[in-house]
A protein has these predicted regions:
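Active-site beta3 strand of CheY-like receiver
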Residues: 45-51
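Hydrophobic/aromatic residues positioned on beta-strands within the core alpha/beta folds
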Residues: 80-82
Length: 126
């Protein structure tokens, strides 16, 4: 069974691109357009890893991860933060992020970081 990764980004093009990269590498991918939708998805099925944008409407990525970390009923879920602004990764590291990637996303960096932090990894394709 492929590792399940949840992608959270308000930009549909970014969501599609990340799904393409991750699914092509053999991961199962869930997509959420904001942190509110992602929260419901996590409660329904906890992913092995979350890739989330920092700047989103309603609730930013930092607030989303802080809410996850505050819920003791949820398992620890590794998080990779995405941002288009190089404003440092201090807040993300405080929340226990395993990585911080600048947009535009390089597929090789994304996949390497995911592989380092997902138990079980992808399912071989073909």
């Amino acid at each position: 069974m492929a590792a399940y990764i949840l992608v959270v980004d308000d930009d549909p093009d970014i969501r599609s691109l990340l799904r393409l990269h991750l699914a092509s590498a053999g991961y199962e991918v869930g997509l959420a357009e904001d942190a509110i939708q992602a929260g419901y998805m996590v409660l329904a099925r906890a992913p092995e890893l979350i890739v989330t944008d920092v700047r989103m409407p309603y609730m930013d990525g930092f607030e989303f991860v802080a809410a996850l970390r505050a819920d003791n009923a949820l398992p620890y879920i590794p998080v990779i933060f995405l941002t288009s602004v190089d404003d440092g990764d201090h807040r993300g590291r405080e929340l226990g992020a395993v990585g911080y990637l600048l947009k535009p996303i390089r597929a090789d960096r994304l996949l390497a970081l995911v592989a380092q932090n997902v138990p079980g990894g992808p399912v071989p394709i073909g």
